[in-house]
Amino acid sequence: LAFVAGGAEAGTTGKITGRVLSDKKAPVLAVTCFLEGTRFGAYTNEQGQYTILNVPAGTYTLRFQRVGYEIKSVQGVVVSSDQTTTQDIVLGETAIQMQEVVVTAERPPVEVSVTSSQVSLTAKEIKALPVQELNDVVNLQAGVVDGHFRGGRKDEVQYQVDGVSANNAYDNSSSLRLDRSLLQEVQVISGTFDAEYGQAMSGVVNAVLKQGTEKFHLEGEGYLGGFLLSDPSVRLVSDQFQPGALASLQLTASGPLAKNTLFLLSGRYYHFEDYVKGTRLFVPTDSSDFENGIPHPTGDGKSVPLGYSSEWGGAAKLTNTSLHNTKLSYQAVWNVVDGKRMQYAYRFNPDGAPTQQTFAIFHGLDWNQILSKSTYFDLSFRQNYFDYNDYVYEDVFDPRYDAAGPARGDPGFEDGAFIQGVELNRFTQTTNAFLIKGSVVNQVNSIVQVKAGGELQFPAVSFGSPGTLVYTIVNGQQTLVRHVDDPPDYPGVKTYHPVLAATFAQAVVERPTLTFRGGLRLDYFDARSTVPSDPANPANSIAGAPPSEPVPTTAKFKLAPRLGIAFPIEKRAAVHFAYGHFYQYPSIGTIFTNSDYNTLNDLQAGGVSYGVLGNPDVQPEKTIQYEMGYKHAITDNLGADLTVFYKDIRNLLGVEFVQTYNDAEYARLTNVDFGDAVGFTLAIDHRRLGPVAVALDYTWMEALGNSSDPRETATRAEAGEDPRPRLAYFNWDQRHKLDLTVSMARSDDYSASIVLRAASGQPYTPVLESGFGNGQEPNSGRKPSGMVIDMRGEKTVKVKNTNMSVYARVYNLLDSKFLNGTVFNSTGSPYYSRFPESDQVTLNDPTRFYAPRRIELGVTFGM
């Protein structure tokens, strides 16, 4: 095989393979097969086979030509990350040059060679859905419940941008918010995944970003929107129609910058105001007479949104291919967000609530080098920087803290409402991580491909209170005292420097009768911290006890095998089996929170609670996944996929109670929690029925464990409940989930889509009587089921060389009030309580309902 120059980053490319035959069914040698508008191509060998490696994810026109044969082009060839696209073709012999024959490729309704559950959506498919951001796309997939993949905890998912981890090591969530305008492809792996992917136990989301184009291209989008409530009184708000609640403006330019250099630059501004409004009757510095129940409001009485968000975001890419067989690129993605989290308690004193500011940037260099016609390597360098602040005033010494005092309410005015003061809690979190990832790929022959590589991460994670405000008696009077880095009781902001590394090797064998994917991954983690040598003397302060000096944490090594097999049982049907071990080190924010054991210096038997102590020397959490499925392309446009899965979850973070030498007891994190998840998914995809397409995803699942949160056991013990581990449904367990998408489209004319999301109720813990019932089994009740419908309609027009469209999007079309939100423990209903007096604060809170109907009107253009 001969390959033409090309290159792209790891985790963003796939390959195209196939066979070229004559109209007499004989293989055709030396046919030129290339992707129009690119440098990617190959020649066929004696068997008529060709393979084009290292093709960036996207949609292409594949052209076949050779002297003595007709020229054919196949439009709409879709390439997905880390997957093989097969495109066979038949060329008719001819003695004269004939007009080119153009055919359109159709993605098969199921991919019979795929060995695990995964979905790849192209930019065109994403645009047609009523979604705006990456998370909207992810939550529509089978087996995903509000970010939980197949029953796992929310922090068990690896989010990647162009094949490199974009997770924040503090909580293992994505550092970025990605708008759909940036997405070339989204790959969601909810089953087992290759050895290349680590630091995840439940799933992988790989967002492939768009890149520069060979010709200059400019596109943009803008929309305005608001809320339209069917019955405001049910939601406890007064305004039925709230226009102007959100606005977005996005612009993207791409094209050639210089010879062999392409650029992409995209920017977006987005503003959102929540539908629940507050009234500024009070200001933080008001002086109400709380003893006599006499308020003294001095606010201006204006209506203001209790929650809002203003965001600037964007991306930049610069790609150069001047050097032979070399591709160098720089990319950056960023978000700047300023907003306020909705807190209904501040509805009359909105200026007393804290604001949140976020700055995130994910940027770096990529080097792709073709070493030979069948071998290439990728090397990526990234900085993942994330900064988050949550407080009312930036400076802890701001005199407005003294003037306002703590947030206070008066039940005589309105129970649960703060009418004076400000929130005194303060928090900041910064992650500055440097990542290196590299891999080498070799196409051994037309059947076997091998890949090996590794990655190294150096995160610096800081978090804590940037100054703690505490009221203390000084000279007989209540005085607001500042504590800045005053350990062990007020430690301030601390920085931690763990190291994560991994190496992997994997192979893919693709034959007409078998697809095999297998690999091994070796993970390394070192918290680079200390723990007490003897937990029974945690602060080395117990008289007469054996000494307990701090000792370094140990480095952890884990070897994880991965295996996937697909057997085509006929041309249009296949079965697959997948198995794998998946390890994940707990988030830095979890294991290091409250990890200074000097706080236990005065620990006495029967003493006060010190909370749950952190533990940086825990083992990695582990999940073993099993998956088996059957997929069948019933027709050229109708496919079905049935997959059964089981997850054995072990070594989850939980709480142990440690007995000290002086008969005291404290709680600390360790690997004691466990669980499992079992279920199946059914996907039916009808690509085309005239202009109509239908896709249905159904998930049945049962997810149980001994706790939904690492600190849950300690919480039960403090409440006087039985802390012993026992199986209960996870908080996010959901027996049934159904996603139905119906779309109708005519190319370059119109499109419309409706997405229906239906779900059975998640668990809750019932209460029998007011103040009683804590002994009820956790999560033994079920919330009501719910359904939400979203829709999108678009009309396209062409004005000279500009493609324009107008569209409307409606979220929660039927204005549903409930979808697995808050319920009252006495009734299991979100609407009423058996104990209205004790639950009055919650009954008055409209934020417990699902977000109301939201209408957006927008326009797009491209030229």
Question: Where are these predicted regions, by residue range?
Answer:
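Transmembrane beta-barrel strands of outer-membrane/channel proteins
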Residues: 105, 218-226, 265-269, 330-336, ...
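C-terminal beta-signal and adjacent terminal beta-strands/loops
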Residues: 747-770, 794-863
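Membrane-embedded beta-barrel scaffold of Gram-negative outer-membrane proteins
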Residues: 378, 382, 576, 580, ...
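Signature of Gram-negative outer-membrane beta-barrel scaffolds
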Residues: 301, 423, 435, 443, ...
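Periplasmic N-terminal accessory/gating domains of Gram-negative outer-membrane beta-barrel systems
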Residues: 70, 75-86, 99-204, 208-211, ...
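Periplasm-facing N-terminal accessory domains of Gram-negative outer-membrane beta-barrel systems
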Residues: 5-104, 109
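Gram-negative outer-membrane beta-barrel transporters
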Residues: 525, 641-655, 664-767
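Transmembrane beta-barrel wall of Gram-negative outer-membrane proteins
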Residues: 242-339, 358-376, 561
